[in-house]
Amino acid sequence: MELTVARTGVERSPIEKKPSVVFEAPDLARPGEPVSSEEIRFFVDNGFLVKKRLIDKTAVEEALGKTWAYFGDQVPMAEGTTAPTPDDASTWASPEWAPMPRPDDSGPYQGRQRIVYGGHTVKLHDLGDADFLMDLVPNHPRVRAVAQAILGDDLRPSERTRGVYAVFPNAGEVDPDDPGRLTRPLGPHTDQVCQQLNACAYLDDVPPRGGGFTVYPGSHKIMFRAHRFEANWSPLPDFRDAVRRVVAEIEPVEFAGDKGDVIFWHGRMVHSSGVHLGDSIRWAVFADFTLDGEVLSAEEHKRIGQFEWFKDAKRFAEDAPVGEDMWRGWRLGR
């Protein structure tokens, strides 16, 4: 399958993408420890960590109910079509949305619509700073304790999440003999913003091949050295070759899981939305964590072409050049 890296504009000679495999998370947790030493070693080696049922089930279910209500009020459907509803799974497959407006050319929402809908994906960015999502993920004591144990105590105060991302099932028949069914949906990419630590929290159960978040294990080590600076978006001339190497050589893993599971990953990881062959909706909240330091203003981000209002990942005013130790400044349980 031909590689297209969505956030980097890579479209060159075809690369055969590897099919993803469903990840089986090892039980490395230790009672009373936000992150065990075994989990730290796993994160350093692989670039991600799955914390099972980190968020209380009741809180997650309440958040999903509020998300459904917001979705029903805010996402327009094509004329004459049925909107998805939480109590009727027959309405979930291949929804038909109304035409999406162009993003604003200026102002606080410059460059990205407040709600993105197209194909089988809806991104409720505008919901990202809602109190119930802030309390559920970046400001949740257990979530923040994990982020502090991995990255550091001095985290930048969280201002928003990226919102809720929903991946809807496909109404079309899938040929079980088509090998492309496990590679075609993958869109490996990295994000063009300041990146240190990210989190993905599931708002509902995500079965295998149900659109689970997908990463390329170990790619954080390769992509870290494809940048000039440790955290700021600063690709070197060999950046695109590094992405192509990751996609060609690394087998991606897909995260199936339960509501309340949270996946933490290093910000330089190559990642993708997952393969969705099922009949459920994958609901997830995405959040960003960085150490607390002076960052550029919104206008400065716009001037350098790195303004992404829906991400809580601001470019540092000063950032260290990439050196031998990619974990310089990270706590890593110490």
Q: Residue locations for each model-derived region?
A:
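Non-heme Fe(II)/2-oxoglutarate
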Residues: 2-29, 73, 81, 97, ...
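Histidine-centered catalytic micro-motifs
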Residues: 185-192, 269-273
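Short, surface-exposed loop/helix-turn segments at secondary-structure junctions
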Residues: 107-108, 175-186, 237-249, 283, ...
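A short secondary-structure junction signal
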Residues: 176-181, 198-199, 209-215, 224-228, ...
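Non-heme Fe(II)-dependent double-stranded beta-helix
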Residues: 2-45, 52-189
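Phosphate/oxyanion-binding loops and surfaces in catalytic or ligand/nucleic-acid-binding neighborhoods
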Residues: 70-73, 153, 206, 222, ...
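Short, conserved beta-strand element in jelly-roll/cupin
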Residues: 189-208, 256-259, 264, 288-292
